[in-house]
Curated annotation (Swiss-Prot):
Subcellular location: Cell inner membrane
Subcellular location, principal: membrane
EC top class named in words: translocase
Designated name of the protein: Nod factor export ATP-binding protein I
GO CC annotations on file: plasma membrane
GO molecular function: ATP binding; ATP hydrolysis activity
Binding site for ATP: G47, T48, N49, G50, A51, G52, K53, S54
Organism: Azorhizobium caulinodans (strain ATCC 43989 / DSM 5975 / JCM 20966 / LMG 6465 / NBRC 14845 / NCIMB 13405 / ORS 571)
Length: 320
């Protein structure tokens, strides 16, 4: 089923970006980007390093203005009215921005107070989150003495303390063990169930699969494609990745190209995306004695194979 791309005429957005351009170091890192996130939606953003993800998040937060275009949160233009929206946004940035000489509990309480919560409100909410994340044992130790994973959870707790309407997770699970990652997912799901809109920026397929309803792929500063997550995952199950060692089997590349496949090369290994129902090429590879590894496609492959026409997969909205 083909989906209609979101447009400025549609309503019920929490976050909208229209025609956003941003230049950094003389280079356009955002190039007329359009993105519309519905209220209560869990929206994933994926893309290679340098695709423009961090620049977009900084503009959404009102930390830097766009050169052209408009970004609104709750209908407020973040260039002019960002202060009216920021108090209801919880963000987990990539970089550690905690007060290192304060304890996790003090960091979370401070943020709650900055968001105009009363001390009792902030304390009650902090207790709930620290208990959920099993952090009570380290709640009163200086942040500088904690592991990277515990510091990361402290940043998540800080972002959630004021029950934000928008939660932005920028590689939030980096450094977390499986138990902590699961606790984070559960907490985000609980916040989303009460109406919070969630933006997930991650290079981990597991995060995007678990925490999103829709996924956008940002490439060269624009939203190249969007998918409903469930439809995309189902469609990926109908694709497979064929991999060969080019140094061992130079003939394999010729066979890939003869079948019109988009080929990705990395450290001498060639990979190509292929329909899982088509066994003709594999039969040829076997006949030619080309050692081939076969696996199902994953979300990671959308980044690995930018030349593949992913816009035809999973009811995608369409390529810009």
């Amino acid at each position: 089923m083909m989906l209609m791309r979101e447009s400025p005429d549609d309503r019920h957005y929490t976050v909208s970006a229209t025609g956003v351009w941003k230049k950094r170091g003389g280079i356009d890192v955002l190039r007329g980007l359009d993105m519309y996130v519905r209220r209560g939606e869990r929206y994933g953003i994926m893309g290679t390093n340098g695709a423009g993800k961090s620049s977009l998040i900084n503009i959404i937060l009102g930390l830097t203005p766009p050169d052209r275009g408009t970004v609104t949160v709750f209908g407020k233009d973040m260039r002019r009215q960002g202060h009216l929206a920021r108090a209801r946004i919880g963000v987990v940035p990539q970089d550690d921005c905690l007060e290192q000489n304060m304890t996790p509990y003090e960091n979370v309480m401070l943020y709650g107070r900055l968001c105009r919560m009363t001390a009792s409100e902030a304390r009650k909410r902090a207790d709930q989150i620290f208990e959920k994340f099993s952090m009570m044992d380290c709640a009163n130790r200086p942040v500088r003495l904690l592991s990277g994973g515990m510091r990361r959870l402290t940043m998540v707790a800080r972002a959630l303390v004021n029950d934000p309407y928008v939660i932005i997770l920028d590689e939030a699970t980096v450094g977390l063990d499986a138990k902590s990652r699961s606790a984070l997912w559960q907490q985000i799901e609980a916040s989303n169930a009460t109406g919070a809109t969630v933006l997930v920026i991650s290079h981990l397929a597991e995060d995007l699969e678990r925490m999103t309803d829709r996924i956008a792929c940002i490439c060269a500063g624009t939203v190249r494609a969007e998918w409903e997550t469930a439809a995309l995952l189902k469609a990926l199950g109908a694709l497979k990745i064929l991999e060969i060692d080019h140094s061992v089997s130079p003939r394999g590349k010729e066979l890939f190209c003869n079948h019109g496949l988009h080929v990705h090369e990395n450290d001498g290994r060639l990979s190509a995306v292929h329909p899982s129902s088509d066994f003709a090429l594999e039969a040829v590879l076997k006949k030619e004695a080309v050692p081939t590894t076969t696996r199902f496609a994953t979300l990671d492959d959308i980044i690995r194979f930018p030349g593949f026409p992913w816009t035809g997969v999973g009811g995608v909205n369409g390529e810009k």
